Amino acid sequence: MTHPVADPSDQARASNFDLSVVISTHDRPEQLREAIDAVRAQTHPGPIEIIVVYDKAEPDLTLADDEPHRPVRVLTNDRTPGLPGSRNTGAAAATAPVLGFCDDDDLWMPTKVARQLELMAETGASTCVTHVVITVEGRSSGRGSTPVMRFEDLLRSRRIEGTMVAAIVDRHAFWTEIGPLYEDIPGGFAEDYEWMLRAARHADIAVVTETFVQVRWVVRSHFRLNWPDWEAALGLVLERNPEFADVPAGRARVEGQIAFAIAAQGRRRDGLRRAKRSLGSSWREPRAYLAAAVALGVPAPWVVRTLNKRGHGI
């Protein structure tokens, strides 16, 4: 497990930047350049440093640029392989007082940084997210919610804007009160959700109620069919957040996801038992019924692809 530690960049010189943006990447060169361009095109007048972190891939050093207003640094993940380690690598190299995170297949809209820094200054929040739009195979669906995201909200529902690519966070809080991303989560699955739960437990999260991130989903993702990791990761989320016991709808949701992962592994009887446990918390939980359907023979990949094409996940 990655524990909260002292900010590794505390001993660096005073930063000349308002924001450090960590872009994690793996073998998506064209999309990576688009993600970098979107950050460089931010309307925020102050300087922003961009830190590209390659994970399990050869870095393209030609992307580095020392332009003072929007410089680009290129690193390789020197921590645990995977997205959590990649993001922590970039955060450790950052010098600005505020961190932002972006993946190579996501795009920030031009006024994202300006609006979020403005809201953080107004509210004193240590973490701020924005609404997002999900694009799948050319079709887009918008998602959004209330101006504040509380811990109880995230226990109850996996809010789509509760994701690292929509967030900026005070760097000191990231390393201390909240803590960095846990690198021991199997397959790096649910690392965003687990971190957002910790951030919201620390303090309410401010929400910009406008859409400033385009999440470009790929229907076939490397972890979506890795059911054992999915099962184990969600089990850790429940274990590390005992407060789920007091939120039946939220516990039913996560139990339903675990049931689906179990059934998708071919462990049909265990999947049905876990689905029953989910329904015991809330009979309305749709994931429990999907898990039961898979346990009875409906192909799990077909269910996942069908949901993904509509901008939804399990």
How should each PLM-predicted stretch be described?
Residues D37-P47:
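Short, acidic, metal-binding catalytic loop of nucleotide-sugar glycosyltransferases
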Residues H69-P71, G85-S86, R115-G179:
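Flexible acidic/His/Gly-enriched loops in nucleotide-sugar-dependent glycosyltransferase catalytic domains
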Residues T211, V215-V218, F223-G250, R268-G280:
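Catalytic core of nucleotide-sugar-dependent glycosyltransferases
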Residues M149-P228:
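Conserved nucleotide-sugar donor-binding catalytic segment
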